[in-house]
Amino acid sequence: NCPYCVVYCCPPAYCQASGCRPP
């Protein structure tokens, strides 16, 4: 899981895979 998804979204593929969204 992306530890920075609240402030910064990981690379798009990882962001999507981890269920995070860009701010």
From Swiss-Prot:
Bridged cysteine pairs (disulfide): 2-10, 5-15, 9-20
Lineage, highest ranks first: Eukaryota, Metazoa, Spiralia, Lophotrochozoa, Mollusca
Entry annotated with the keyword DNA damage: no
Entry annotated with the keyword Signal: no
Coiled-coil annotated residue ranges, if any: none
Annotated localization: Secreted
Organism superkingdom: Eukaryota
GO molecular function: toxin activity
Primary location recorded for the protein, binned into one broad class: secreted
Name of the protein in its database record: Conotoxin Tx6.5
Domain notes: The cysteine framework is VI/VII (C-C-CC-C-C).
Entry's family note: Belongs to the conotoxin U superfamily.
UniProt modified residues of type 4-hydroxyproline: 12
Tissues of expression: Expressed by the venom duct.
Gene Ontology CC terms: extracellular region
Misc. remarks from the entry: Negative results: Does not affect sodium channels Nav1.2/SCN2A, Nav1.7/SCN9A and Nav1.8/SCN10A, acetylcholine receptors alpha-3/CHRNA3 and alpha-7/CHRNA7, calcium channels Cav1.3/CACNA1D and Cav2.2/CACNA1B. Does not impact cell proliferation. Exists in two forms, due to cis-trans isomerization at 11-Pro-Pro-12.
Organism: Conus textile
Alphabetized UniProt keyword annotations: Disulfide bond, Hydroxylation, Secreted, Toxin
